[in-house]
């Protein structure tokens, strides 16, 4: 009775279907035990109860996954089929979703977080360079450099004569005259009607019987440009441009003649008075520029008073000199700039005492040109200058464009300088105290000797780096131009080489441990201005592989990296690959970049090396773009990079109230003009003391994968972590049962063989069987 009561209670606790399923399993297990007990085998028959089928049924009965149990407790085959299809469909859906999750995880996507950091901001290193790399007065003392410049000067002279022979060059003035003539033709009717109306309304016109001389004089006075005498300081070659002052000249040697613009009230350019000569030009244009001779086939009886000078540095008079009309009275009188500025009414005349150069051409209607292929721009040149191999190596053959020739001359200068030692190149460029006159940082005076370090650049010569010491780094306490670096730099334009197109300063902003690269990442500041460079700091932190490709280590140990002693930079990597490729092919390197230890740069005068270099540069292309020839070179970004964004502004400098430096023997106005033409004020400062942190992070990591994987398991199959553990236990049991059944089958076969052996041989067989059993038990 009690047994029946307990059975009823158990049935009520379980569901009906669960009870039936459990009862069937119990009866089935009992039957299997009875059948197993009836068999007479040599091994334990109780292990047969743990069959794979019973394990699966027991798992489905007790698992926390609800779907599998529904198949086994279904009342009919249709229900089992439906539940099986549903579970299988959900299993496929889960597999699809799981594959997408795995694909998303394997893509290693990343996101960039941007945040503002308020912390101490270290001031970057600033490298200052003169746009003129070497002093003209010094480089012309070195034979190899002088030869390089002579080849350039000869090429310029030759290209001008060749251009005149092939196709006469049309001047800007001739283009302007042609445009005026076209307008006259297009608007001839309107112009004629306007002139008729003007004549009718103007009854006070001057008589037309005045002399042609006075008419010519009056026309000159109304034109825009004229020659004017001024006070100048001329330094260097006599043909170089002079520095003009507003004050009267102290002596005749300080006089110069300038081209005066009436509209702008500016006198520029100015040249020493000794290079000018008086002339009577047969033709002067409406703007004031004159022609020393008439074009072929034209005649004129006019005689316009003008001042002329040679366009080149030669002492002989040019066939086409630069001429500008005079507005003074008489043949050799000229207006004085200092009198115009002081607005004096006293008429002061000065007679020029310069001796005009010997005239080699007569003023006729026909002109002759002498072909100058063998003419040199400067006398007493060495034989190597006219050597055909030298001319071929320099690459001026066939060039007529002045800009292209200047670019080529700059390259040739770098080739020549690369053959010199560092000590020799340093001596030819500006020294620290010549270049840097004044400096302050954070409102305090700098120590020019200690705070600036020399940096020799292949293109800009001597450069000087501020804040180069990592162990003693400057930090800005405030934002604004007053609390950064303010430096007065003297570039001395009077000593500029002919290859320097513009006057000013080149600066690069970079971390102290990185190479400056002023040619690529630099900024230019002109003379005569206070240039302000406001900077904002950004820190970029990139993820390494597998999320991205970046270089984690800053120190470079590769011997092929040509910028030894500096941190890794992608620009340095590209240049190193480019340079090493050229060395492999030509056995010499490009002078724009350093060479590894034991190698040399290509010679400027070696045509074979230059040809090989040009050929390889043409095949490789820009060293920033990897081609098939550089496919082995992989240049990655740094994992941590400091970026400085720069904004530029400028104002005219000096103001007139500025306390300037070395102005011995000059008035205040002369000193101001002197510095305006030769110096630049530079300000570099932080616009704000916070900085942006751009940090990469993984967009989908392992934690996200596990969470989404578990969510889909629970959604489609009703699985949890416990269910996963149950499946793992089931797999272990199934594997152990498989190997156990294989072992028992082996024992059964051995037992069967012993029964078939004759009795006289069974002892040996039994012994061997025991040995096998012992081996299995081990």
UniProtKB/Swiss-Prot annotation:
Keywords: Glycoprotein, Ion channel, Ion transport, Membrane, Neurodegeneration, Sodium, Sodium channel, Sodium transport, Transmembrane, Transmembrane helix, Transport
Record's compositionally biased regions (Basic and acidic residues): 154-165
TM stretches of this protein: 83-103, 712-732
Positions of the UniProt region annotated as Disordered: 154-180, 201-220, 346-380
GO molecular function, a single term: ligand-gated sodium channel activity
Topology term for the membrane: Multi-pass membrane protein
Cellular location(s): Membrane
Signal sequence, start to end: none
Record's GO cellular component terms: plasma membrane
Positions in the Cytoplasmic compartment: 1-82, 733-778
Glycosylated position list: 202, 209, 272, 342, 473, 492, 606
Family, per entry: Belongs to the amiloride-sensitive sodium channel (TC 1.A.6) family.
Role this protein plays: Probable sodium channel subunit. Required by a subset of neurons.
Protein name: Degenerin deg-1
Naturally occurring in which organism (per UniProt): Caenorhabditis elegans
């Amino acid at each position: 009775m009690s047994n029946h009561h307990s059975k009823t209670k158990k049935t009520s606790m379980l569901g009906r279907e669960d009870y039936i399923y459990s009862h069937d399993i119990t009866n089935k297990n009992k039957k299997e035990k009875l059948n197993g007990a009836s068999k007479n085998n040599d091994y334990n028959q109780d292990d047969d109860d743990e069959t794979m089928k019973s394990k699966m049924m027991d798992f489905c009965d007790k698992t926390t996954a609800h779907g599998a149990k529904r198949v086994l407790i279904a009342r009919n085959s249709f229900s089992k089929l439906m539940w099986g299809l549903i579970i299988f469909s959900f299993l496929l859906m889960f597999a699809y979703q799981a594959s997408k999750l795995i694909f998303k995880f394997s893509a290693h996507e990343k996101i960039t977080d941007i945040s503002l950091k308020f912390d101490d901001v270290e001031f970057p290193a600033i490298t200052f360079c003169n746009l003129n790399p070497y002093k003209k007065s010094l480089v012309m003392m070195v034979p190899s450099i002088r030869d390089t410049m002579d080849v350039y000067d000869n090429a310029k002279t030759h290209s001008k004569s060749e251009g005149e022979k092939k196709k006469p060059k049309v001047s800007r003035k001739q283009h302007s005259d042609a445009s005026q003539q076209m307008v006259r033709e297009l608007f001839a009717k309107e112009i004629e009607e306007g002139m008729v109306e003007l004549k009718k309304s103007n009854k006070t016109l001057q008589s037309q019987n005045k002399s042609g001389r006075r008419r010519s004089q009056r026309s000159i006075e109304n034109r825009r440009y004229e020659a004017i005498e001024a006070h100048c300081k001329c330094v260097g070659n006599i043909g170089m441009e002079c520095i003009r002052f507003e004050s009267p000249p102290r002596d005749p040697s300080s006089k110069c003649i300038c081209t005066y613009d009436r509209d702008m009230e500016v006198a520029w350019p100015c040249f020493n008075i000794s290079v000018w000569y008086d002339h009577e030009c047969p033709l002067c244009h409406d703007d004031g520029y004159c022609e020393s001779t008439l074009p072929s086939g034209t005649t004129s009886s006019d005689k316009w008073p003008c001042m002329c000078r040679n366009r080149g540095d030669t002492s002989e008079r040019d066939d086409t000199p630069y001429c500008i009309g005079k507005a003074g009275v008489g043949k050799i009188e000229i207006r004085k700039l200092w009198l115009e500025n002081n607005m004096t009414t006293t008429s002061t005349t000065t007679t020029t005492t310069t001796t005009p150069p010997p005239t080699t051409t007569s003023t006729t209607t026909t002109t002759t040109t002498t072909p100058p292929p063998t003419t040199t721009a400067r006398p007493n040149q060495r034989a190597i200058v006219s050597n055909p191999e030298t001319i071929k190596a320099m690459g001026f053959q066939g060039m007529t464009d002045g800009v292209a020739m200047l670019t080529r001359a700059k390259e040739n200068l770098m080739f020549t300088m690369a053959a010199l030692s560092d000590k020799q190149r340093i001596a030819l460029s500006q020294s620290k105290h010549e270049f840097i006159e004044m400096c302050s940082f954070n409102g305090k005076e700098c120590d020019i000797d200690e705070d600036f370090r020399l940096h020799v650049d292949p293109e800009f010569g001597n450069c000087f780096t501020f804040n180069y010491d990592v162990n003693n780094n400057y930090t800005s306490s405030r934002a604004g131009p007053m609390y950064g670096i303010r430096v007065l730099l003297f570039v001395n334009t009077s000593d500029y080489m002919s290859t320097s197109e513009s006057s000013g300063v080149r600066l690069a902003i970079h971390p102290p441990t990185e190479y400056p690269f002023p040619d690529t990442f630099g900024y230019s500041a002109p003379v005569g201005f206070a240039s302000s460079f406001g900077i904002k700091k950004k820190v970029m932190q990139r993820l390494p592989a597998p999320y991205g490709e970046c270089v984690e280590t800053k120190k470079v140990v590769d011997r092929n990296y040509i910028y030894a002693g500096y941190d890794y930079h992608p620009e340095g990597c590209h240049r190193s690959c480019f340079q090493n490729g050229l060395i492999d092919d030509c056995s010499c390197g490009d002078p724009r970049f350093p060479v590894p230890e034991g190698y040399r740069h290509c010679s400027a005068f070696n045509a074979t090396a230059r040809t090989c270099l040009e050929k390889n540069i043409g095949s490789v292309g820009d060293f920033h773009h990897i081609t098939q020839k550089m496919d082995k070179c992989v240049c990655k970004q740094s994992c941590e990079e400091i970026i400085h964004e720069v904004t530029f502004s400028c104002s005219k400098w000096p103001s007139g109230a500025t306390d300037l430096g070395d102005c011995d023997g000059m008035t205040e106005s002369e000193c101001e003009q002197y510095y305006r033409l030769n110096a630049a004020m530079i300000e570099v400062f932080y616009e704000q003391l916070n900085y942006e942190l751009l940090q990469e992070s993984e967009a989908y990591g392992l934690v996200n994968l596990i969470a989404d994987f578990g969510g889909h398991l629970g959604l489609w199959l009703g699985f949890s972590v416990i269910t996963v553990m149950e499946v793992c236990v089931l797999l272990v049991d199934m594997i152990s049962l498989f190997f156990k059944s294989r072992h028992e089958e082996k024992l059964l076969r051995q037992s069967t063989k012993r029964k078939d052996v004759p009795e006289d041989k069974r002892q040996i067989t039994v012994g061997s069987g025991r040995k096998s059993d012992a081996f299995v038990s081990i």
